[in-house]
Amino acid sequence: LAERFREVLPAPHLAFLRSRPVMIRAGRHVLTHAGAAAETPLVRQTRADLIWPRHAAIPDLVPPVDLGGRIVVHGHVPVAIPRAEGWRINVDNEAEAPRFLTVEGPPA
């Protein structure tokens, strides 16, 4: 499937997607696709740590050691409703299965 996707996706689109950051720090929030690897400093997280693993499905993980009170906001592991668990918030509520999309605005 991945190979077929690369065949049909125009090269400029693929280049754009590959050029995007895998982690964004925005104030007290850290935004990633799949969370962050527990007990690994943010500065040492790999691309794979941030976009592929299912560690976000495991509750009570120890946060990255240099999180400094920030909150990791991620998806990748479908949940029925957004779930806040200590140092992380999972906002993947299966938007690809026509239900609803979680949207967060700036803090008031």
Predicted regions mapped to residue ranges:
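Acidic, His/Gly-enriched loop-helix segments that form or flank divalent-metal centers
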Residues: L1-R99
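Short, charged, surface-exposed secondary-structure boundary motifs
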Residues: P98-P107
